[in-house]
Amino acid sequence: MVDYSVWDHIEVSDDEDETHPNIDTASLFRWRHQARVERMEQFQKEKEELDRGCRECKRKVAECQRKLKELEVAEGGGQVELERLRAEAQQLRKEERSWEQKLEDMRKKEKNMPWNVDTLSKDGFSKSMVNTKPEKAEEDSEEAREQKHKTFVEKYEKQIKHFGMLHRWDDSQKYLSDNVHLVCEETANYLVIWCIDLEVEEKCALMEQVAHQTMVMQFILELAKSLKVDPRACFRQFFTKIKTADQQYMEGFKYELEAFKERVRGRAKLRIEKAMKEYEEEERKKRLGPGGLDPVEVYESLPEELQKCFDVKDVQMLQDAISKMDPTDAKYHMQRCIDSGLWVPNSKSGEAKEGEEAGPGDPLLEAVPKAGNEKDISA
């Protein structure tokens, strides 16, 4: 059986309660509520005072017992003081029981108080919780991202290239619907690199086609990021916007496409310049002489009269020019020519010893032919 007795004494007013015609019902309810709130506040205040008094009394009892114990343990403690503390402890325990009784009476009184509109119910929840998508975990390391990209490309490179060659919106949407795994960052990264490769190879028309598909994938990824959803769940929304001729969206797409193509051209130019520098450095290293000097650089650093001697390949003319120069300068320039491999002592005569420094009076030198785009200045 359900006990309904708890409902017998509820201090609430019904809107249908009869009141005197000269009494405003709303005001009457307001006065009753105010009086009820004041009674509740007074009751709560008395309860808090009793609680504080009880705690203070318990603290005094504990303090008195501590002093009593210390005095009993101490040798030569005063008997008079001991008796006084015992009497005080006994009195405090009586007060403690009195406070506890008052608190118990207060609890009973609170339990028997009639319910009202303010105490009928209590908040079950003070806040609402909504499940949200967890924040993306910390980005993987550079090596992990590179490995992920490499694995993805090895598996789907053919499909990515097929997507990059598509022209029509409908074809792109259908292909992504059939190969939804392509809607990801790895596809976009591969298309970007492919665009740069095509520009380096001077396949400009094909680069512009692939650049268009690259921006399609980039816009899908940006849309997913703004909606905070998986790109595979929103790529159809991108095509819907584009195909319904959303003018502002289309203009934004075209602007980003042109900016992307300019960036691709810039990156391709930098790559070509870097490759040229690397090639030139390799060629320079190949032509370094036995002393580690570049013959082209040495030739360009020679005085004009010595350069003419190399241009006409005339040994006698070179010896005459050297004899007219300052001996120190002549020795410096000829030693650089030998270290660069531009000239070597005449091995046929055997008169020039290996490793001997060349000077103005060294007549036994022969030109060494140079390969490639270097000047052929052999005697």
UniProtKB/Swiss-Prot annotation:
Cellular component terms per the entry's GO annotation: cytoplasm; cytosol; HSP90-CDC37 chaperone complex; protein folding chaperone complex; protein-containing complex; ruffle membrane
Subunit note: Probably forms a complex composed of chaperones HSP90 and HSP70, co-chaperones STIP1/HOP, CDC37, PPP5C, PTGES3/p23, TSC1 and client protein TSC2. Probably forms a complex composed of chaperones HSP90 and HSP70, co-chaperones CDC37, PPP5C, TSC1 and client protein TSC2, CDK4, AKT, RAF1 and NR3C1; this complex does not contain co-chaperones STIP1/HOP and PTGES3/p23. Forms a complex with Hsp90/HSP90AB1 and CDK6. Interacts with HSP90AA1. Interacts with AR, CDK4, CDK6 and EIF2AK1. Interacts with RB1. Interacts with KSR1. Interacts with FLCN, FNIP1 and FNIP2.
BP terms from Gene Ontology: positive regulation of type 2 mitophagy; post-transcriptional regulation of gene expression; protein folding; protein stabilization; regulation of type I interferon-mediated signaling pathway; regulation of type II interferon-mediated signaling pathway
Compartments (UniProt record): Cytoplasm
Keywords: Acetylation, Chaperone, Cytoplasm, Phosphoprotein, Ubl conjugation
Keyword Cytoplasm: yes
Modified residues (N-acetylmethionine): 1
Modified-residue entries (Phosphoserine), positions: 13, 121, 378
Protein name as annotated: Hsp90 co-chaperone Cdc37
Principal subcellular localisation of the protein: cytoplasm
Residues covered by region (Disordered): 123-146, 344-379
Record's comment on post-translational modification: Constitutively sumoylated by UBE2I.
The family this protein is said to belong to: Belongs to the CDC37 family.
GO MF assignments: heat shock protein binding; Hsp90 protein binding; kinase binding; mitogen-activated protein kinase kinase kinase binding; protein kinase B binding; protein kinase binding; protein-folding chaperone binding; scaffold protein binding
Biological role: Co-chaperone that binds to numerous kinases and promotes their interaction with the Hsp90 complex, resulting in stabilization and promotion of their activity. Inhibits HSP90AA1 ATPase activity.
Residues annotated with Phosphothreonine modification: 119
Modified residues (N-acetylvaline): 2
Naturally occurring in which organism (per UniProt): Rattus norvegicus
Modified residues annotated as N6-acetyllysine in this record: 155
